[in-house]
Amino acid sequence: MLRFSFFSVILLLFGLPLTAQESLLPPGTVWTDQNGLHVNAHGGNVIHVGDTYYWYGESRSRVGGAMPGVSLYTSKDMLHWHDCGIVLSTVADTACPIQRGCVIERPKVVRCPHTDNYVMLFHLELKGKGYAAAMMGFADSPSPEGPFTFRRALRPTAGKWPMDFKRKDRKLARGHRPEDYKDWWTPSWEKAVREGMYVARDLKGGQMSRDQTIFVDDDGKAYQISSSEENLTLHINELTSDYMGFTGRYVRVAPGEMNEAPTLLKHNGTYWLITSGCTGWAPNEARMYSAKSIWGPWTRHPSPCRGPKAKTTFDGQGNYIFRQGQRFIFMADRWQPKKLSESPHIWLPITFDAEGVPVIEWKD
């Protein structure tokens, strides 16, 4: 009986030819480029343009030191990857937000149909500031090959309340001050978080934005989903028509539940949000939410993962859901904090059960 490897399943799902090299890419192992080096593109995404796949991600220094920027790898078959170098570089200019020594995470690139530009959004932390900045960076390029030009960095939706906050909700949020709660995870503190304490705190300067992804809907509208409010609550932010800014329209998802690493897909009219808990570099069980509208309400479901190590998302953390037609791949990283550049990649097909609920089953 003919035995198919995991990656042959991926290739068949995406209508790609099988090759003799298919067994080189089992999930969670070393995936090499044309130079025999592990693909150093983490927390990013893949887009398909013409006959080429473009894989963007965090380029983590292989020898220690500052991050060089965002890397790009290309492939014709999703098996053989070519290192194209750095397409968004950190710079020496100390007045620039992306000066060397900053932290760039979770870069995502999408094509904007309204401008025909390729837009990159990424989580940015300023040099020497730890994770206090919690900003979004914007860059763009006329070509998927780059290079990308850095445009600006900011916190989203300054001066704007969530769309569903009525006057009474704003009053409740303003009634809480973080300095009045010395201890986290008390019932009163949790209530204050749910009622928007951190939204009110950050209203003037903009909301925090850390782990993030981009989702482009069927109508061409784009949304940025990010961990906000001290990583306690997800925000879904509508992007402007050129994808280079925020309209100010946003909602909160799962207030106080501590989600990060958001990924999003839409299948048969339902939006599915697959996330991670907040446990640093250590893996944890994936979470899942659904809604009939991007604006919610969102309902929580059990983890979509099945098989060995499902309780730790196969020892990984999601970074993107790559879609081609109605086929989806869940992309994840197995973080290696002592050498992040060597963190293995996990790509697994997403299937749907009889009720249309996503399932991610381990295959090797």
Language model features with spans:
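Carbohydrate-active catalytic/glycan-binding domains of CAZyme proteins
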Residues: 20-364
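Bacterial Sec-dependent N-terminal signal peptides
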Residues: 1-21
